[in-house]
């Protein structure tokens, strides 16, 4: 898709980050928020068909936000991940299935041990098609969990602009694996995902139960620690 929404660029690099080139050729983009962007970036960038995942910020009113500013909960941004993907290998609805099963859709006050609006789950959509597919995926997720759609706390919002995060946040799970693995364990992310989704946690498998078929979902050809003691992403 084109990198424009209402005439404004979807992506915009802050002065402290390298510019991220817009997609070329057949690549498409998705911007998703699901709590700690270290985790969501790592969960999605390994999917077949995903070319790149970038940690950053979206949804707020401040240009060029820094991590410190977003952490104040005063800018309106969420930690988000920009995913570039090949639609011939993975469709947006298929990508969304993996997204849903990597978040707690019943929690709108943050995610796991991370609390606050900057950690709330959001699907940012850049077209009417993406919006329709996101809404269908919400209904499918609710059906799989045997919950009413009113219980789902993932927001679906129009994408205005994505700001790449600071360089030290990018690919954090790979570059700082010991710290990342401890943080993820201490936060209880995977334990909660397993409790919600069961065997389908973290997977992109087809929707189960009474979930409706989402159009375009088939791609072409130790105990938990006190959350207040979690490592800070400084």
Locate each region found by the language model.
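Flexible coil/turn and secondary-structure edge motifs
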Residues: 2-234
């Amino acid at each position: 898709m084109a990198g424009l929404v209402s005439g404004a660029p979807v992506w915009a690099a802050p002065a402290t980050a390298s510019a991220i080139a817009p997609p070329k050729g057949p690549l498409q983009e998705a911007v998703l928020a699901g709590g700690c962007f270290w985790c969501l970036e790592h969960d999605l960038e390994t999917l077949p068909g995903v070319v790149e995942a970038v940690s950053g910020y979206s949804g707020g009113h401040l240009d060029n936000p820094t991590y410190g500013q977003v952490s104040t909960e005063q800018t309106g941004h969420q930690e988000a991940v920009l995913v570039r993907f090949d639609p011939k290998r993975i469709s947006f609805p298929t990508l969304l299935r993996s997204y849903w099963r990597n978040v707690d859709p019943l929690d709108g006050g943050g995610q796991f041990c991370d609390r606050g609006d900057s950690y709330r789950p959001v699907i940012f959509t850049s077209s009417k098609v993406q919006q329709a597919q996101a809404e269908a995926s919400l209904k499918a997720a609710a059906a799989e969990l045997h919950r009413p759609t009113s219980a789902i706390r993932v927001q679906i919002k129009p994408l205005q602009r994505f700001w790449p995060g600071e360089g030290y946040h990018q690919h954090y799970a790979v570059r700082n694996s010991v710290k990342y693995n401890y943080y993820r364990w201490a936060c209880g992310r995977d334990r909660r995902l397993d409790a919600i989704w069961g065997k389908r946690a973290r997977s992109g498998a087809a929707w189960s139960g009474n979930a409706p078929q989402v159009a375009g979902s088939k791609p072409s050809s130790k105990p938990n620690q006190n959350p207040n003691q979690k490592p800070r992403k400084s």
